[in-house]
Amino acid sequence: MKYQLFLSLALCVGLGASAQTLPYQNPNLSAKERAVDLCSRLTLEEKAMLMLDESPAIPRLGIKKFFWWSEALHGAANMGNVTNFPEPVGMAASFNPHLLFKVFDIASTEFRAQYNHRMYDLNGEDMKMRSLSVWTPNVNIFRDPRWGRGQETYGEDPYLTSVMGVQVVKGLQGPEDARYRKLWACAKHYAVHSGPEYTRHTANLTDVSARDFWETYMPAFKTLVKDAKVREVMCAYQRLDDDPCCGSTRLLQQILRDEWGFEYLVVSDCGAVSDFYENHKSSSDAVHGTSKAVLAGTDVECGFNYAYKSLPEAVRKGLLSEKEVDKHVIRLLEGRFDLGEMDDPSLVEWSKIPYSAMSTKASANVALDMARQTIVLLQNKNNILPLKKNAEKIAIIGPNAHNEPMMWGNYNGTPNHTVTILDGVKAKQKKLVYIPGCDLTNDKVMECHLATDCVTPDGKKGLKGTFWNNTEMAGKPFTTEYYTKPVNVTTAGMHVFAPNLPIEDFSAKYETTFTAKEAGEYVVNVESTGHFELYVNGKQQFVNHIWRATPTRTVLKAEKGQKFDIEVRFQTVKTWGASMKIDVARELNIDYQETIAQLKGINKVIFCGGIAPSLEGEEMPVNIEGFKGGDRTSIELPKVQREFLKALKAAGKQVIYVNCSGSAIALQPETESCDAIVQAWYPGQEGGTAVADVLFGDYNPGGKLSVTFYKNDQQLPDYEDYSMKGRTYRYFDDALFPFGYGLSYTTFEVGEAKVEAATDGALYNVQIPVTNTGTKNGSETIQLYIRNLQDPDGPLKSLRGFERLDIKAGKTATANLKLTKESLEFWDAETNTMRTKPGKYEILYGTSSLDKDLKKLTITL
């Protein structure tokens, strides 16, 4: 194999005439010993190149090309033939850390399987987004529902985020006692990072109180470092108290390494070091920015122009020493040895994972199980749910009923199959009418003609997309895709235009011939970020070269039977990301009454609405009413959907509303216009089956909200204010649907808790009996909160334990929870530390964070 030949040649060069194994080539030595030896053989220029996220090969020493940047937010990302799980904010709603471990064990297996196939079976080389270092999990706190990246997190609570984050890391990295790590995971974005997206490169957070810093923003990072032994920490873009996070000695050295004992790698967010001198102006240029980041403790720079290329100049100018550089190089080399990436694959157990481990039936079953457990039943008037199969004709409508990209979330891979909500319902309900109804935000309806009236040059229905892994459409195409639904893709959030296509430096051509079945006006809608051109019958209609998503509308005035050859040419430009939307459609005004007329004789309507990852996400080129740059400016349901639901209610329909979103939606009007409300998040490849299972009673919902659902925009504090006052269940108690809330098709009764002194190092063991008093088997999540009675300025309550119990009808199960010293630890202003103070504490336990759902007892320390 090429790999073995490369290694053999490198060894020959290194051994020379002595034919003696060098220390760094000896797999029996520790990773640290090998890294120290290898570092000593590098030139300063080579060291600088190794400190980039895209590290080139150094053949003379047998060092291969290596990429530090890959993603596995909810499954292996940026590649095809993978298992796509629900978005993390939804998986947090499962309150099931054991199942979450299974999810990420599968994700790491699929990552290793594709890596092994490429590197060893195909004799290839490392690729960006396909390497063994994955920048997951995102353990920032979802403090404000307007943050577009909140969907990537495990919700608003520090404890829930910590517990779930530990399982993510363990699933990705594999057993600690293994010889090599399966992957390297990364806790991001350190620290105090949760929007806005549009200010992240310039923000300076100077209003974060010590209490909020230690009680809210830091616990998850500390837990992942100390309990999960996470191997990477990513420093964030913004400044904290005037210092960029990637240049903060306090964050990276004093807290992370000195206080918490972190021994591994710090990586920068992409472009964060360049922000020092381009946006924050805290450094004068790349050389000074580099020295600041390196001296503070940032080991690897992810970037575009790469400030770290100036590292040798910084050393020559005396801004830092080569000995300082060596500390960072040794850490990153330790990582590569720890992954087995530099050793013969026969020594690495993970290198034996075959490509057949990708996208298996077993992994799909886990995706389905997780999707079911994420679903939260928020409202069920008169027990309208579950529906009876085929008892009557029902309708399913709405913009998310048949929306595959919505199901996948952001930072996603592309699965081999996706079950939309429409697909799932169709599989159970034969008496069914489907009407798209409306767009997510637009008050026009686009009647798509791709599937019915468009034919590709090679005779297939729809639109053909041809892709090249260069920007000139040159040479052999990389891949081809076909579309019978509108194209809607973006590289923002690490999506790809086509499976396995790079997210940078590519080009595409989209082609079809449209034949008008009727005379009239049709439109070709093209919206893109990058360089894009539209040709109709060989004539150029426009050319755009732009970094911001730009919509275009080209009218086709057609006679019956008239043909139009349509071609869109695209190439990426050096922007944040690329995007493309294409549709050939008839533009119709929304007519609620016309749609309702089509529902004659139908009483029950499933409306699938909400928003989508194309509207909320990371630094996106979106600027429409309610949305800005990836964030939301309003948490209300988009007006077009709200009005549609009101019209259905006014027509006497019973509405089951399925909300798909990665964040909380203000649904107060919908509690009146809808009979049932189901929160489905972005549920992954099996999400349609999971939603249908819940709607028709094949699965009893047991998910609990991982975030607070507020009543309206007016309840939200200033988005740019990082104070926790008035935010989340910990400092706000007037929610529409509170954190930890979720209904079931059965009923549960929580018994009296039994609290005993622990003998295993914890303070107390807490046993809470729960009885299923209904007629259906179901699951209930018992939640334990602590209220510090001697701390009037502290949180109203803080989650400190939970357990999801599966309980058969008429049976009782017991939640067994532990309270440790850390469970009763809060910020103490007198000593400026987190500590457990003597005094009275309330233990609150029950089925949600709402006071009426909790019982309480008092303990004294």
Swiss-Prot record:
It comes from Xylanibacter ruminicola (strain ATCC 19189 / DSM 19721 / CIP 105475 / JCM 8958 / 23). SUPFAM superfamilies: (Trans)glycosidases (SSF51445), Beta-D-glucan exohydrolase, C-terminal domain (SSF52279). Changing residue 269 to A/N: Abolishes xylosidase activity. Its EC number is 3.2.1.37, 3.2.1.55. This is Xylan 1,4-beta-xylosidase. The gene is xyl3A. The active site is at residues 269, 616. Residues 458-600 form the PA14 domain. It catalyses: Hydrolysis of (1->4)-beta-D-xylans, to remove successive D-xylose residues from the non-reducing termini; Hydrolysis of terminal non-reducing alpha-L-arabinofuranoside residues in alpha-L-arabinosides. Belongs to the glycosyl hydrolase 3 family.
